[in-house]
Amino acid sequence: MAVFGMVSAVSGFIKIRYLLDKAVIDNMVFRCHYRITTAILFTCCIIVTANNLIGDPISCINDGAIPMHVINTFCWITYTYTIPGQQHRQIGTDVAGPGLGNEYGQEKRYHSYYQWVPFVLFFQGLMFYVPHWVWKNMEDGKIRMITDGLRGMVSVPDDYRRDRQDRILKYFVNSLNTHNGYSFAYFFCELLNFINVIVNIFMVDKFLGGAFMSYGTDVLKFSNMDQDKRFDPMIEIFPRLTKCTFHKFGPSGSVQKHDTLCVLALNILNEKIYIFLWFWFIILATISGVAVLYSLVVIMMPTTRETIIKRSYRSAQRKEIAGLVRRLEIGDFLILHFLSQNLSTRSYSDMLQQLCGLLGASRTPSAPSTLEMNRISHPIYPPVETFGGGKETET
């Protein structure tokens, strides 16, 4: 029941669902962070937590001098260790397992991360949601208000559609060159996504004792090595068998040392989770970096904006598009780009055609803000409940 409760809480938090009439205020790379990555991390957190609750995450073997539950609890809440110098010795003849053996004069590698894995995964899930939360609050529903009634597959009368298009066009013309703050907020959150995934890679590397950076490449090398010579790097980072030392007082008051052998069954799960996260973080960092570079190109090169607009408005002449782009600042372009993702092709093409004519014929006055438009006697935006039958759910 506790596991189902956690699943319900997580699903209510990340709200992974798709609405045809939901306002689009970001791109696919952005959604890979707050939807896919957050869902992956929270799911892994639930799986590890359920494994700890249902099974025995650690089972230690001793000579019977110490109760089993005592030594299990002690080794779980403190740490276990392996001997790196004993990793490559023959199992069954020289050592009992990888990293186990005579520890005299040998360096020890301590393992205490396993008790913190669910908490770290949950914290990482929150980290990947933060940029979206920041952007959603800074965006403040602007695109949803502008495009309300024309998004998705909602069928509306032609008169209503034309009226809505005219109002969107009026807002856009009247608010021309006032959206730069809006665009810079978006690009800042896009950069925040890239920084966040890089920080997470270094954070996990620190958490696993500096072994995460080369974890994926080591596993790939291992799979290509000769069967008789290879050593699994996953066992070195996530050992199944470890040692634990328990001290207690003997009958005469002297300190007695008890060596125990601990089986960490949960590491079979941990190694699979982190090898997947290694590849996913590398992919996510790559596409996020490309997205940031792409945004820089769009900001610095107006010809790129012409190409993007032309792609969604194929019937226009390049001269018309070039004239339109010259009148638009980067914030206006971003609003126009989001409109292309939320409006139907017909509505967007009609609006662009009228926009090219209007901006080519007149200068634009200063504009009211989106909030001011809600207080004028004839509001540009009709009530949300006019179409759709209910309140829109946002992520």
UniProtKB/Swiss-Prot annotation:
Annotated GO MF terms: gap junction channel activity
Chief place where the protein resides: membrane
GO biological-process terms attached to the record: dorsal closure; intercellular transport; monoatomic ion transmembrane transport; phototransduction; phototransduction, visible light
InterPro entries found in the cross-reference section: Innexin
Cytoplasmic side: 1-37, 136-183, 294-395
Subcellular location: Cell membrane; Cell junction, Gap junction; Cytoplasm; Lateral cell membrane
Residues on Extracellular side: 59-114, 205-272
One GO term describing the cellular component: plasma membrane
Protein name: Innexin inx3
Record organism: Drosophila melanogaster
